[in-house]
UniProtKB/Swiss-Prot annotation:
GO biological process: lipid catabolic process; protein folding
Record field: transmembrane: 7-28
Gene that specifies this protein: lifO
Free-text function comment from the UniProt entry: May be involved in the folding of the extracellular lipase during its passage through the periplasm.
Annotated source species: Pseudomonas wisconsinensis
Subcellular location(s) of the protein: Cell inner membrane
Membrane association type: Single-pass membrane protein
A family per Pfam: Lipase_chap
Name of this chain's protein: Lipase chaperone
UniProt record similarity statement: Belongs to the lipase chaperone family.
Main location: membrane
GO CC annotations on file: plasma membrane
């Protein structure tokens, strides 16, 4: 069991790492065929802006909720600011502002999103900042268009189950994204929009590489990881340290469950660090995870008994698909497939 879950943990870490990069657009549901989003070019964006009233009265402009219903009831994320000379200030808040509107693409379409974004920005920014924002948005959309092909490339069979291959795939994706960003943005804009993300992504990949080295003792590995952590910007380092402490607390609480502790004992342990609402949320999450693992193990047991009937490979694969569809929701099946792929590479069966 431990070997299986150690590998599955790597898969989860890798999947989590990918979310550092993939922020556009929302995933296409399984039941729908994948389609290509037509991202407008910088020139067409400028033309669209020039045909829209830049400073129409507020009452003449439809609200964001009307134009983009999926954003109803939400606050505009990010911020558009100017310096004393009226120039656009570049920081992560500008990217957050873009992404807030772009999150509605799947629901409302890109044309409506761009129209709403330009109308909102026109009420917030004077010139020359407005023109600078439009130019930057054009670069951002061009970058998104160029990066979509990279995002859509699936992992091959080896990359799905081998940690070293997964790490190499992530390193390659990171390098290619970095090249795309350098090609589409000035050095100043790249640092402002992606600097923190790139620093943490580089730290994550370097940490995974250290963890996979078998020529290091535990003390050497700990020292190298600490050196990597020290290179992070202060804010990221403090955040990472908080995450590490939280992860250690959760691991200790999970060990309590494995050692036979009851819920009250785990609650008391977590209460030494977290407030009551957070303790309850963590207990609920751990309970759901234990239930899911038990459900998955029951599925594996039923699958093993069915596969013991001497079915052909094709019949066995069809039976496995049918069993997944019967026992798991569509949201859970990707996780089941990942676990199954890992289990298929293990020489020993999973412990019940």
């Amino acid at each position: 069991m431990s070997k299986f879950f150690s590998l599955s943990l790597v898969a989860v870490v890798v999947a989590g790492g990918l979310t550092l990069y993939w922020r556009w657009p929302a995933a296409v549901p399984e039941a729908q065929p994948a389609t290509t989003v037509a991202v407008p070019s910088r020139q067409s964006l400028i033309e669209q802006a020039s045909t829209s009233p830049a400073k129409a009265p507020a009452e003449a402009q439809p609200s964001i909720a009307v134009t983009l219903p999926s954003l109803a009831g939400t606050e505009v994320d990010g911020q558009l600011r100017t310096d004393a000379a009226g120039n656009l200030l570049l920081d992560l808040a500008v990217r957050d502002y873009f992404d807030y509107f772009l999150s509605a693409v799947d629901h409302s379409g890109l044309d409506a999103v761009i129209e709403a974004l330009l109308a909102d920005a026109g009420r917030r920014l004077p010139e020359p900042a407005l023109g600078q924002m439009i130019s930057l948005l054009g670069d951002y959309l061009d970058y998104k268009r160029a990066s979509m092909a990279l995002m859509q490339q699936p992992l091959d069979a080896r990359q799905q189950v081998e940690p070293q291959a997964q790490l190499q795939a992530l390193q390659s994706a990171f390098a290619r994204l970095d090249e795309l960003r350098r090609a589409h943005f000035s050095a100043t804009a790249q640092e402002a929009l992606f600097g923190a993300e790139q620093a943490y992504a580089r730290y994550t990949l370097d940490s995974l590489a250290v963890q996979q080295r078998d020529d290091l003792g535990e003390a050497q590995r700990t020292q190298l990881l600490e050196q990597l952590r020290e290179r992070l910007p202060d804010a990221l380092r403090e955040s990472e340290q908080r995450q590490q402490l939280a992860q250690e607390q959760l691991q200790r609480s999970e060990q309590l469950w494995r050692d036979g502790a009851d819920e009250q004992q785990v609650r008391e342990f977590l209460a030494m660090t977290y407030d009551p609402d957070t303790v309850q949320r963590l207990l609920d999450e751990q309970r759901r995870e234990r239930d899911w693992q038990q459900h998955y193990q029951a599925y594996r047991n039923e699958l093993a008994s069915l596969q013991g009937r001497g079915l052909s490979e094709a019949d066995g694969e069809q039976l496995q698909r049918q069993l997944r569809e019967r026992l798991f929701s569509s949201e859970d099946r990707h996780r089941v497939e990942t676990y199954d792929a890992i289990a298929a590479k293990q020489p020993e069966p999973l412990d019940p």
